[in-house]
């Protein structure tokens, strides 16, 4: 799992505005700092995807912040961005404010994947806290036949 920055200070403010206040103009900056971090290591992936939102949250927010970052990152990496490989199969509570045990219970079994057999997938998210979402997404992709899953986020909370 790779994260570009600790989730505090300016990065926290930018990600909060990006996610909750329609500040989508930050997408290029966020994609670039994640690209810069990933460029420090070998990221041998075939495709890029992102942590999906449930369709009801997508309608409410109007966009998926992870998808916007993934679009920028895929362009910089020269990799195909796939919107169809991950799906959130049920609604969950927002993870914000939940403790570790509730986060795990809340997100367990919430994702399904397809179209990734024999593919290495780079999955993008905005922030990682406990890593439970990353684990669940990785399990869904592996179950669908992905050979490798690399999880990358802009921010990483220190808990």
Give the residues covered by each predicted segment:
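Conserved PRPP/pyrophosphate-binding segment of the phosphoribosyltransferase/PRPP-pathway fold
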Residues: 1-123, 130-159
